[in-house]
Amino acid sequence: MADVRFVAIGDSFTEGVGDELPDGRVRGWADIAAQGWADAAGHPIEYANFAIRGKLAWPIIEEQLEPALALEPTHLSFNGGGNDMLRPRTNMEHIADAFSRVLRRCDEQGVRMILLSGANPAGQLPMGSTIQRRGDELSAAVLRRVSGRDDVVRALNWPDHELSTGAYWSEDRLHMNSHGHHRVA
């Protein structure tokens, strides 16, 4: 059995949309991180990516969390909320509660949680100020929920100003390109 069993859940950010391979598959930050982890360890790790593009935060939890935990991972990454922020009406506190649910289930199963915030596309989008405000609210709400939890790995991409520049984004300006996924990994 591998020392590391890493499972990723999320939406297009974790799936890898925007970083298409020549054969049409996508390769995102989670795939790159898993390979880097194996390379650093000097042996393979077990890895599964359950992420599905377009998913809202709570459906990610409802559809992906339990199947992911059934694999008995040592580490589980979660990102969500980016699609929720694009909706006309959304409650950031309710979305942040999804992160609390994942953390609780990880605690119950003895799984180390890797928490990611999405990269910030606000500067490139119409209604960017709304996206900026919602992303700031979601980030703050999630960080309050994991405050004092040194066991939670945090990869905070939202405040990374370099990552929000155009060089890291695909043509649609909603998804990161290969450079963006590599920076996050």
PLM features per residue range, with description:
Residues 15, 56, 122:
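Flexible, glycine-rich phosphate/dinucleotide-binding loops
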Residues 26-27, 51-54, 88, 128-131:
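Short linear motifs at secondary-structure transitions and domain/linker junctions
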Residues 1-53, 65-72:
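Serine-esterase "nucleophile elbow" of acetyl-processing enzymes
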Residues 36-39, 43-46, 59-183:
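Alpha-helical cap/lid subdomain in secreted, periplasmic
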